[in-house]
Amino acid sequence: MAAGDFRLCDVVLDDTIGRSTPDVEHERAVAIFDLIEENSFAPIGHAGGPYRLNISLVDSKLVFAIRTEEGIDVATHILSLTPFRRIVKDYFMICESYYEAIRSATPSRIEAIDMGRRGIHNEGSQTLKDRLTGKIEVDFDTARRLFTLVCVLYWRG
C-alpha cells in the first residue's frame, strides 16, 4: 500500500440483482473502465489505497464497501436512496428519449436531449458527491462515474 495513493483499483457491482438491458450493461462496463482508469477516491481518515469498492443495494439503501487492494476492510458507508429517487427517475426517462431519438430524430433534437441528459446526470453526480462529504472525498468526474453505477444498480434493482 502506497501512502497517499487515493484511487480505486477495482469496482464491483452487486451481482445478486441480475443483469439488465444491453444498453444499461454497456453503460456499466464503460463507467467501471473509465472509473478505474482515472479517479480520485479518498476515504476520510485512511492513510491511502489503492482501494477496492463494492457497490450494492441493501434494504433500499446504497452501500459502499471499501477495502484496500489487499482486501483489508477500510469502511462501509450506507446512504439513503431517497435523495436520488427523483433524479434517477428523470435520468431514466430522458435516457429512454435519447435512445429513441438516436434512431430517428434530427441531430439538433438529439443534441438537445443529450444536453438535458447530461444536466440531470450532473445533478445526480453533485448529489452523490455531497452525500459522500465527510465519508469519502471524490472529485466531480469520479462522482459522475459512480453516479452512473448507482443508476445501473437502481435500474437492475
Curated annotation (Swiss-Prot):
Report the protein name in the record.
UPF0262 protein Rleg2_0240
Task: State the organism of origin.
Answer: Rhizobium leguminosarum bv. trifolii (strain WSM2304)
Q: Which family does it belong to?
A: Belongs to the UPF0262 family.
- Which segment of the chain is annotated as a signal peptide? none
Query: InterPro entries of this UniProt entry?
Result: UCP032146
- Which NCBIfam families is this protein grouped with? PRK02853.1
Pfam families under this entry? UPF0262 (PF06793)
